[in-house]
Regions:
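A short alpha-helical cap/connector motif
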Residues: 1-133, 138-159, 163-226
Length: 226
């Protein structure tokens, strides 16, 4: 009986395949001692296709790590597009920048180093983002969602990663700060009138998790939208 790992391997092999640039990015990330918490290949291609489906030309990524998903976004926005990626750790950002140069997409990516809470306000007044991907410290999910709406516009796509946490997101009594952050994010998406959202559970080699998908329906008066 095939396992979910077998299915993940089959889908990756069949729908994603092998890419020397992306493989090198992961190798460089691991060689630098970064944690193996990047999005899985099938999920990365999902984000890539979602970006293309949305026609996104400006993408905001909160949580760069080694730049693996950043490369996927940069390829999706194409020439003339722009990806702004925020990374709290300067060592991670250095690895990401090297990976982006190797991938030939560094000219369309701006990696900004600092805590999301500090960097996001500096983006106010810039052109609105078409898609926002949130994959950083889970405790700050609601802060990042608020900024996603403020820096977006009606129609901006928002993706919030790691929202199921092995099913623990359904536990209202959890004391795990990451799970609490995931819960607060889901509750905000379900109650904040600026968003229309849903969520999907995922099961792959990294285990049981999920992703929330939303669109901004009203950026609000504080928004930086066009």
């Amino acid at each position: 009986m095939p396992t979910h790992d077998d299915v993940d391997a089959f889908l990756t092999r069949t729908l994603v395949g092998s890419d020397p640039i992306l493989d090198a990015a992961l190798s460089a990330q691991h060689a630098a001692g970064l944690p193996s918490i990047e999005v899985a290949p099938v999920n990365a291609k999902f984000l890539h296709l979602l970006t293309r489906i949305a026609g996104a030309r400006r993408v905001l990524e909160i949580g760069t790590l080694g730049g693996y998903s950043t490369i996927w976004f940069a390829r999706a926005v194409g020439e003339g597009g722009r990806v702004v990626s925020i990374e709290a750790e300067s060592a991670n950002a250095d690895v990401a920048r090297a990976n982006l140069r190797r991938a030939g997409v560094a000219d369309r990516v701006d990696v900004r180093v600092g805590r999301g809470a500090d960097v996001l306000p500096t983006l106010e007044g810039e052109e609105a983002f078409d898609l926002v991907f949130i994959d950083a410290d889970k405790e700050s999910n609601t802060l990042y969602l608020d900024w996603a709406a403020r820096l977006g516009r009606p129609g901006t796509v928002v993706v919030l990663d790691n929202v199921v946490r092995g099913g623990d997101v359904a536990d209202a009594d959890t004391t795990d700060s990451k799970v609490q952050g995931a819960r607060r994010g889901i509750l905000m998406l379900g109650s904040d009138p600026r968003f229309d959202a849903t969520a999907l559970q995922t099961l792959d080699r990294k285990g049981w998790d999920g992703v929330a998908l939303a669109i901004v329906v009203d950026a609000g008066e504080a928004g930086a939208g066009s």
